[in-house]
Structure formats: structure tokens, C-alpha cells
């Protein structure tokens, strides 16, 4: 590979002194609320992105002011589990140190803050550190937050799966001390020139972000096939014995560039649970060595597997681990939604799943959600578990505490509102006004849009039938729209591409149905399709399966060939 062809980010990483760059100098510069262009790429590895309020861009430009810069900081919380004490600290930071005054639960089981001024970044990171939380590798060309099924019913199996997710997260952390030096005031360690400080990642880390998930069938709330690397738990009784390993998934694409496409992961076979770390490291290092470092649009693992071929990639994994894959075990992949309300676990404790619209934990008129979770955290003796559907589980509630927890949840509007199956299965990304990549609204618009879709379902007599609907402001796919039965991907303000045909379970992608259309046409198209579905569907047939069977869209079986074809 010619060095001249490398993407600019590769040079930035090489010259960054293991992710230090000039971040410290930028942090100390008060004349601007921004970091330098190069450091804006490096700070992602530390867990945050530079943003600005796009609603105010033109106004500030007219006033000859720089954009209203702020930062989005994302925490690393493997499996989405945190203690009530940690949640209280998270809440306090949101209230005192961010302009958004809210906490955003993400589609990868963690939380993020919006509206952080540069001067508050260090304080926030230090406050999180005091609670054993951090933002290391929450963004950047590294392994991101590892997801794990927060199954509140099979508690023993969940704990075993969570232990592996936590191991995967801890073992794939960058080794650089840059985070501790810059944000926690640790002294810079003296290293010998050429010393290997990143045994897994190397000096230039991965070509692009890398996402892992651990699923516990039949639940697929983590959307395991949309990840770069997925481990599907195989149990004997209530004991975790191994995983079906899948690799090569990813949602991101670019409008108008057919060389880019979303993809679901391939099934590679069965591995023993104790070998999962070896296999994870093998897949990551192959991607490190083989991945595209010239064109970042083609640098995810999915493109590496397509380029080299499944069998070649599989053989390389087996060569690096010294272990052969066994035939995949039969497992049932089912629902991707959360189990709302109270569920009792095998340990007799109770778990309360709360629907959080858009994942936005904020006090709203008549619904002080943030205060409600704060008050619950003050008395709760179990865990808080964030889900990949942007919701919250109050987990491990003793029977004696159940009534008090429910009373608080109802008092603060966390319970009591009727949630349809469709709304409960649907998610949206943040998009405007903070995301620099957004072409259209998502989080702010999505609830009202869903209300109109629900009205159409009611009209055609199947409001009780859940449909997975997802909306993003751009095709990068943070809310996994290409794995939704109805996917809406922003193309321009007020305009979206409409995708149809994914399976309800997340085992088939959708396909473009209409391009660059506004709300009225979207609803008109859905009205017609819903009428056909209501009269023509087979027993138990989901909407996504119907659109493929009836020929509304063709099935996407091989994304590289079928998604755009």
C-alpha cells in the first residue's frame, strides 16, 4: 500500500504520540471554544466529539461570532450496567455542567452528554472517574462500547454473558496513558523510543470504528448482526457454554455511493466461551492488518470480509487462534424490543423496564423523567441497566421495595403512559441540532411522526401489531435504520429515503423503496401499504416479511450485490 494514498486520519494517528496530539494545548486555549482540526479527530478516542448548535449558526455568523461550539461526551459502560450511586453522579453532571441539562441514553447501551463547553470537559471526566466511569474508547478507531443483552428474566445467564462482555471491553481498551495524563493529571510516563505501548492496536489503531455485542437468545435487542463482531450465547440449561460467532456487520453508508452499503454479519461457527477473547483479538488484529486505510468510507470490517472473501477471512481467524470453528449451534433469534413493565427474575428479584422516548432523560412538562430516575436512584439497591433501545431497566428490585419503586415511577411520569408495540420497538438518532452529519431531523421529529403512523395502524386495524421503525438524520446509521422494517434516513431538511423489507428479528436488511420524499408522501405510501398488509397478510406474518413476499421490495440476501441492485 502506497503511503501517499493513506487517509489523512492515518497520519494524524501516527503523529499523535499515541493520541496525545496537541489536545492539552487546545484545552488551555481560551480564545476559542474549539480544538484544532487535527485534535478534533483525536478527541474522539477520548470519548467526545466537537459540535455546534446548528439552529444558531446563521445568527452567530451574522453577528460575526464563531459557531456556538460544545462537545458531546459518551461514556464507556459495558453492557449498560451502572449502580444507583453512579447514576446519581451522572445526573448531577448533566444538571450542573452541560447546557442541555439532560442525559441521552444511546443505541449502544450507554449515555452521552450534549452541550458541554470546552472549559467543563476536564471536570466532567474527573467527576466520572471518581465514580469508576470513563469515556476511553467510546468513540474513535477502536473497539466501542460492548453491548450485552440486559435480560431481566434469565438473571444467571445474563450475569454470565455480561461477564464476557465486560472482559471483551476491558481487554480491548487502548493501552496509551494519554487519557490519564490529559484529563486526570497523571504524570507523563517516560517510554523508550519504539516501545510497543499498544500490543493489539499498534501505533495507528484500527482503520475505523469497531463494534461488538453479546446476545442471549431468543432476545436480539442488541441487534447482534449489525455489529462488526457478535457473540450469540449458547446455553446448556442455565449455563453459558459457548457462542455462535458472527462478524462483518455494520450500518453506515453514503448517499449516492454504491460502493458503500449496510451489511449484516456472517455466521462463522461455534466457539467455546473461554475462547471468545482469543477470537475477538484475532478478528480485530486481522482488521487492523487487512482493513482499508486509504478510504475511510470503505474501511469497516464488512468491506474487508467482502474484499478477501468469507473463507479466506475464516481461515485467517483459525490460523491466528489455532482453533477451528465448530458447526454453529441451533438457536432461535427473536424479538428486538424491550420487555416493558415488571418482570420477575429467576432469583425472585424484580426488574422494571421503563420506556424513555428517544432515550432523552430530561424533565418535561408533566413528565419530570430526570427527577424521577434521580429519586429512584436514591433508594434503589440494585442496578440501573441501559438498553440498546434507549430505555432504562431498574434491575434487581426486592419484593419488599417493589411498591415504593413503582410509586415513584408513576409519580414522575415514568409509568402510566400507554406505549404501542410499534413505539416500543422504534428508535431514532439525535440528529439536529447538534450532530454535524445530520441532513434532517430525527429525535425531535420522530415522536410526532410515530403518532401519525400509529393512527394509520389504527385505521387499518392492526395497532396491536408491532412494526420496527427507525429514523436517522443521515446514512451513517446510528439508530440501525437499515435493519428496520420501516427505515427512514435523512436526505435533506424534511426529506427522507424510505426503506422497507427488513425482518422483525433483525436477520435481513431492508431495501430502498422511495427516495427523497417528504412526510405527506411517506404517510401516503404507508397508508396504501398498510391497507394491503391488513387484507393480504398471512397468519403471524410481520410487516417486513409481507413487503418481501408480496414483491413490494426484493429481499436483500447479499448486501454487496442486492442492497443497491
Swiss-Prot record:
TM stretches of this protein: none
Pfam families for the chain: NIR_SIR (PF01077), NIR_SIR_ferr (PF03460)
Residue numbers binding siroheme: 478
Enzyme Commission identifier(s): 1.8.1.2
Cofactor binding note of this UniProt entry: Binds 1 siroheme per subunit.
Gene Ontology BP terms: cysteine biosynthetic process; hydrogen sulfide biosynthetic process; sulfate assimilation
Co-factor requirement: siroheme; [4Fe-4S] cluster
Gene Ontology molecular function: any one: NADP binding
Domain of life according to the entry: Bacteria
Pathway terms, separated by semicolons: Sulfur metabolism; hydrogen sulfide biosynthesis; hydrogen sulfide from sulfite (NADPH route): step 1/1
Any one GO CC term of the record: sulfite reductase complex (NADPH)
The UniProt record lists the keyword Ribonucleoprotein: no
Assigned keywords, A-Z: 4Fe-4S, Amino-acid biosynthesis, Cysteine biosynthesis, Heme, Iron, Iron-sulfur, Metal-binding, NADP, Oxidoreductase
Disulphide bond pairs: none
Reaction equation(s) it catalyzes: hydrogen sulfide + 3 NADP(+) + 3 H2O = sulfite + 3 NADPH + 4 H(+)
Binding annotation for [4Fe-4S] cluster: 429, 435, 474, 478
NCBIfam families listed in its UniProt record: CysI, PRK13504.1
Protein purpose: Component of the sulfite reductase complex that catalyzes the 6-electron reduction of sulfite to sulfide. This is one of several activities required for the biosynthesis of L-cysteine from sulfate.
Family: Belongs to the nitrite and sulfite reductase 4Fe-4S domain family.
Known partners and oligomeric status: Alpha(8)-beta(8). The alpha component is a flavoprotein, the beta component is a hemoprotein.
Protein name: Sulfite reductase [NADPH] hemoprotein beta-component
Origin species: Shewanella halifaxensis (strain HAW-EB4)
Amino acid at each position: 500500500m502506497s503511503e501517499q494514498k493513506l487517509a489523512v486520519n492515518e497520519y494524524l494517528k501516527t503523529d499523535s504520540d499515541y493520541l496525545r496530539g496537541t489536545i492539552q494545548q487546545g484545552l488551555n486555549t481560551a480564545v476559542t471554544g474549539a480544538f484544532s482540526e487535527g485534535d478534533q479527530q483525536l478527541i474522539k478516542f477520548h470519548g467526545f466529539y466537537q459540535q455546534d448548535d446548528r439552529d444558531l449558526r446563521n445568527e452567530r455568523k451574522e453577528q460575526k461570532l464563531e459557531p456556538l461550539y460544545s462537545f458531546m461526551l459518551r461514556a464507556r459502560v459495558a453492557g449498560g450496567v451502572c449502580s444507583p450511586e453512579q447514576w446519581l453522579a451522572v445526573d448531577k453532571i448533566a444538571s450542573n455542567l452541560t447546557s442541555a441539562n439532560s442525559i441521552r441514553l444511546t443505541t449502544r447501551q450507554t449515555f452521552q452528554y450534549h452541550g458541554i463547553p470546552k472549559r467543563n470537559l476536564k471536570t466532567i471526566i474527573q467527576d466520572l472517574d471518581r465514580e469508576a466511569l470513563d469515556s476511553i474508547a467510546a468513540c474513535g478507531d477502536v473497539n466501542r462500547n460492548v453491548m450485552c443483552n440486559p435480560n431481566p428474566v434469565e438473571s444467571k445467564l445474563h450475569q454470565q454473558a455480561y461477564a464476557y462482555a465486560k472482559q471483551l471491553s476491558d481487554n480491548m481498551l487502548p493501552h496509551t496513558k494519554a487519557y490519564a495524563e490529559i484529563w486526570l493529571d497523571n504524570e507523563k510516563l517516560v517510554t523508550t523510543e519504539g516501545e510497543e505501548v499498544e500490543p493489539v492496536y499498534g501505533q495507528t489503531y484500527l482503520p475505523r470504528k469497531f463494534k461488538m455485542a453479546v446476545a442471549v437468545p431468543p432476545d436480539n435487542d442488541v441487534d447482534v448482526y449489525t455489529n462488526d463482531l457478535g457473540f450469540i450465547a449458547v446455553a446448556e440449561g442455565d449455563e453459558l457454554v459457548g457462542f455462535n460467532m458472527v462478524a462483518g456487520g455494520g450500518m453506515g453508508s453514503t448517499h449516492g455511493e454504491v460502493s458503500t452499503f449496510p451489511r449484516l454479519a456472517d455466521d462463522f461457527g461455534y466457539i467455546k466461551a473461554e475462547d471468545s477473547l482469543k477470537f475477538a483479538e484475532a478478528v480485530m488484529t486481522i482488521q487492523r492488518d487487512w482493513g482499508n486505510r486509504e478510504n475511510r468510507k470503505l474501511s469497516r470490517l464488512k468491506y474487508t470480509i467482502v474484499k478477501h472473501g468469507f473463507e479466506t477471512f475464516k481461515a485467517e481467524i483459525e490460523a491466528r487462534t489455532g482453533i477451528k470453528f465448530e458447526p454453529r449451534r441451533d438457536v432461535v433469534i427473536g424479538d428486538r424490543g424491550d420487555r416493558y413493565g415488571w418482570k420477575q427474575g429467576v432469583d425472585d428479584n424484580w426488574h422494571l423496564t421503563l420506556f424513555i422516548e428517544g432515550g432523552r432523560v430530561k424533565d418535561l412538562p408533566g413528565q419530570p423523567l430526570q427527577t424521577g430516575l434521580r429519586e429512584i436512584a436514591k433508594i434503589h439497591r440494585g442496578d440501573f441497566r441501559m438498553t440498546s433501545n434507549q430505555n432504562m431497566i431498574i434491575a434487581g428490585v426486592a419484593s419488599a421495595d417493589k411498591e415504593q419503586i413503582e410509586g415513584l415511577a408513576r409519580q414522575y411520569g415514568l409509568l402510566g403512559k400507554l406505549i404501542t408495540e410499534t413505539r416500543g420497538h422504534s428508535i431514532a438518532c439525535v440528529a439536529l441540532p447538534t450532530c454535524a452529519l445530520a441532513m434532517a431531523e430525527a429525535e425531535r421529529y420522530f415522536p410526532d411522526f410515530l403518532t401519525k403512523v400509529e393512527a394509520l395502524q389504527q385505521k387499518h386495524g392492526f395497532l396491536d401489531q408491532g412494526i420496527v421503525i427507525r429514523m436517522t438524520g443521515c446514512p451513517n446509521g446510528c439508530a440501525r435504520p437499515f435493519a428496520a422494517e420501516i427505515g427512514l434516513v435523512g436526505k435533506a431538511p424534511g426529506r427522507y429515503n424510505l426503506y422497507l423489507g427488513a425482518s422483525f428479528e433483525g436477520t435481513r436488511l431492508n431495501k430502498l423503496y422511495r427516495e427523497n420524499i417528504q412526510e405527506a408522501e411517506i404517510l401516503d405510501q404507508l397508508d396504501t401499504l398498510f391497507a394491503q398488509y391488513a387484507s393480504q397478510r398471512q397468519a403471524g406474518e410481520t410487516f417486513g416479511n409481507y413487503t418481501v413476499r408480496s414483491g413490494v421490495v426484493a429481499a436483500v440476501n447479499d448486501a454487496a450485490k442486492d442492497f443497491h441492485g
